[in-house]
Amino acid sequence: MSTILICGHRAYAARGLKSVLEKQGHTVLEFSRGEMKREGNTVTGPVVEIDKNPLFKEDVDVVINFILLQNGSVEENENYIMALLQFCERHSVKRLVQISSISSYPNDAPLIKEDTPIDKHVELKGGYGIIKTAADNLLEKKKDAEPFDIVFVRPGYIVASDNPHPFKGIAKFFGSKLAVLIGDKKATLPCIHRDMFHQCLAEIAIQDMPLCVYLLVEKNNSTKYSYFRSQSRAVVIPLPRRVFFLAADIAKALHVFKERHVCMVKGAFKVNRFDNSLTRNKLKALK
């Protein structure tokens, strides 16, 4: 069995993962931001100094990284990634599993597969997408020089009953019975339930000859509208695609919008197809 470190164990997407891994016989360590302290197998401390944290005494086989400095700059997030790579080297890590996102892919990619290149135009992404894509770009540049595997896991929208913000980026509520969809009825929102996500991670952590990228989306290519309908009975009004595209282009022509703002508007309406056949063939949890 392996010693597995979960970085960012308090994250919504990570809740319950420790139990899944421990039931399979692994020793699980946890790390998150906080004062320098260790209680049992849970360590806290400055995130960007994880490599210098003296409370990690043991070697680690696998690191699963959920940490994203959402209120931090791209530079701060890249500094954390560099510190994490140093930690992995110092603690004899064999595999770093980076929890990435499908938002790392270009908005205009019609078909997304495991080998689809991530977006190189980081500056055109929204705040969350900028950070995720910048971290992925940095890790891709570094992975060949590292003595351990770097594996990217790109899940769809993670669904669970305890999601504190189930409609963030999807719909804006006005009262409890009316909402505006951030996009139209065709805008895609591939999803994966968190329990299935965790079962996949348990396989990925120890799998022989892992894929470079795992694309974790469930079979039905769902949309923002279908997701909303599964979560709420409120009246929801989709936005008109053509009107918003035209408005964004006019705003750019008038120098009110920059190209990034136009991409963010059009990204809310993006329609992608997903083919994760390689991932499905590799993971029992998705079969």
Task: Give the positions of each predicted feature.
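Catalytic helix-loop patch of NAD(P)-dependent Rossmann-fold dehydrogenases
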Residues: 110-153, 157-158, 179
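C-terminal amphipathic/interface module of NAD(P)-dependent oxidoreductases
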Residues: 222, 234-238, 259-287
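Mid/C-terminal beta-alpha module of Rossmann-like enzyme folds, strongest
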Residues: 200-260
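NAD(P)H-binding glycine-rich loop region in Rossmannoid oxidoreductase-like domains
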Residues: 44-83, 87-90, 105
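Substrate-positioning beta->alpha
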Residues: 163-169, 181-205, 211-212
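N-terminal Rossmann NAD(P)H-binding glycine-rich loop of SDR-like oxidoreductase domains
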Residues: 4-24
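Conserved Rossmann-fold NAD(P)-dependent oxidoreductase catalytic core, especially the SDR/UDP-sugar
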Residues: 83-127
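Glycine-rich Rossmann NAD(P)(H)-binding loop
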Residues: 7-8, 160, 182-187, 214-222, ...
